[in-house]
């Protein structure tokens, strides 16, 4: 298992390259300005809805593999991480609220695990992820918003919302496309629409394209090499212990 000291050093390396480090807000969500349009216009989500997720590893640059207690099995937080990715990439979302929703999802997921040790292991990455989020800058979020929002005249915004939700249902749940207009009618503001679209993404995860995080592959390689070296060292120690004094 990776030592706590090694984890801390790795964390400091990541922190040291982040230009947005702020001691006063250490561990607090980064506040980024929501996407805005020119006066007389509102942002609405572009179609097709394009969301990609690298899972939990993307939030920590592949460092999830180094978290103490991390097993090789399925990550119980993975759905929460995919939901966070969808939230950040949805037009009109608010970055720190996406992080808050992720923490609530993670805490509820870990609390629902019956085995105390497994529940504790599940919770360990949450605080690290919270710190990493506070060190993050707004660039990635801003890029997502620019890519996935389009500005339309205010009197056309609601029509565009209805059109988006209708297309979403046509693609991911055509049997219930009749719900689209009613749901869109409730999402009559930028924030409400972002909330609706994020909920749709969570309910219909096929709309999220899962991709591999290159940083995770790199960290997995480091962990594998470290474990192999430890096994070799243990074998050498065992061989040395087997050498009795009578053989000298």
Where does each model-flagged region fall?
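Cleavable N-terminal signal peptides of Sec/SRP-targeted secreted and luminal proteins
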Residues: 3-19
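Position-driven detector of the extreme protein N-terminus
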Residues: 2-3, 224
């Amino acid at each position: 298992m990776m030592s706590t000291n090694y984890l801390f050093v790795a964390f400091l390396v990541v922190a040291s390259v982040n230009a947005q480090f702020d001691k006063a807000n250490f561990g607090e969500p980064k506040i980024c300005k929501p996407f805005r349009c020119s006066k007389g216009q509102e942002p609405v989500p572009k179609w097709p809805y394009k969301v990609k997720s690298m899972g939990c590893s993307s939030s920590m640059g592949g460092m999830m593999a180094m978290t103490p207690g991390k097993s090789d099995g399925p990550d119980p937080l993975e759905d929460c991480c995919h939901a966070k990715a969808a939230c950040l990439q949805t037009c009109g979302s608010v970055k720190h609220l996406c992080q808050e929703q992720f923490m609530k999802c993670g805490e509820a997921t870990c609390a629902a695990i019956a085995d105390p040790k497994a529940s504790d292991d599940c919770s360990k990455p949450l605080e690290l992820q919270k710190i990493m989020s506070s060190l993050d800058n707004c660039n990635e979020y801003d890029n997502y918003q620019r890519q996935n929002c389009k500005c339309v005249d205010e009197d056309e915004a609601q029509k565009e919302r209805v059109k988006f939700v209708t297309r979403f249902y046509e693609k991911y749940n055509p049997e219930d496309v009749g719900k689209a207009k009613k749901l869109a009618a409730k999402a009559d503001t930028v924030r409400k629409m972002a909330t609706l679209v994020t909920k749709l993404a969570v309910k219909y995860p096929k709309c999220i394209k899962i991709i591999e995080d290159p940083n995770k592959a790199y960290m997995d390689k480091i962990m594998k090499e470290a474990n192999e070296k430890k096994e070799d060292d243990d074998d050498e120690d065992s061989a040395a212990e087997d050498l009795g004094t009578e053989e000298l």
